[in-house]
Amino acid sequence: MDWPFPPTPPTCATIMGRFSKMHGLGNDFVVIDAREGAVDITPTRAQAIADRHAGIGCDQLILIGQSDRADVSMRIFNSDGSEVEACGNATRCVPLFVGRDVLIETRAGLLEAKAIDGGAIVDMGAPRLDWDAIPLAYAMDTLTMPVSWEDLPAPAAVNVGNPHVVFFCDDMNGVNFDRLGPLIETDPLFPARVNVNFAQVIGDNHIRLVVWERGAGLTRACGTGACATAVAAVRRKLVSGPTRVTLPGGDLVIDWQPGGHILMTGPATHVFDGEADWTRF
């Protein structure tokens, strides 16, 4: 009897490489060290590696490389293969991965990450609030945008290295994240697509948050989403000072004052190390 599944065809050459599986509050990453040798990561390869059934599985693939401007560079690929500018949770993992405090070159600019017990503090830089920096398709107020989707309140928009829209809901229990998330992410108002944040103030300087991430969908946590939401909340005078942001995966503390940089504090976890043949993806 013939085996019903054809064998995997042999390859002429293999490109073996090591990786680490890491996460920040359950937002998980495959982290590849490309400082000693280039690793060819295409959108198709990133998508295959991120596949939880046929690949290694992750929300984002992180490529750590050399930099002329910083200690290391970081490239970020979502699970759909798209390359993005920033990822707060991944940034907290970098000092744990390299074993020291680091200045990181990203597509969003230079980010400084300092290791603390169990995690890191990251200077995420200053938020951008102008409509064309989000970017939006046309000019409008980004603090209270004159747009709406179904019963959601008027949102705010913030760019923290990547674009975010933030809805402050009175009660999130009735919000259909799986339907509204992709609907808003791909709305023509957002020419670069957008990360969609559903937030609820649940106490003094305490926000509950669920994020539909651009290119990844619902995740356990989104560091840049927590930063964008805290910035929007400060601008609307809903919070003041360091703010606890509770996501499905746990808590982050975000500190921002108007005109300043955003400081994000939270955990980072190393899960395991592995080795893979990248030509098979």
What are these regions (language model features)?
Residues M1-P7, D132, L143, E150, ...:
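Compositionally biased, intrinsically disordered/low-complexity regions enriched for serine, proline
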Residues W3-G118, V166-F281:
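A glycine-rich beta-to-alpha transition motif near the start of alpha/beta enzyme domains, typified by
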Residues F5-T11, R128, L136, A156:
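Generic low-complexity segments that are intrinsically disordered, proline-rich and/or Lys/Arg-biased
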Residues L25, P127, P163:
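Short glycine-rich anion-binding loops that position phosphate/pyrophosphate groups of nucleotides
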Residues R100-A139, L143:
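Hydrophobic alpha-helical segments and helix pairs
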Residues D123, P155-N159, R208-V210:
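Active-site-proximal beta-strand elements of phosphoester/diester hydrolases
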Residues L143-G174:
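Internal active-site segments that recognize and position negatively charged phosphoryl groups
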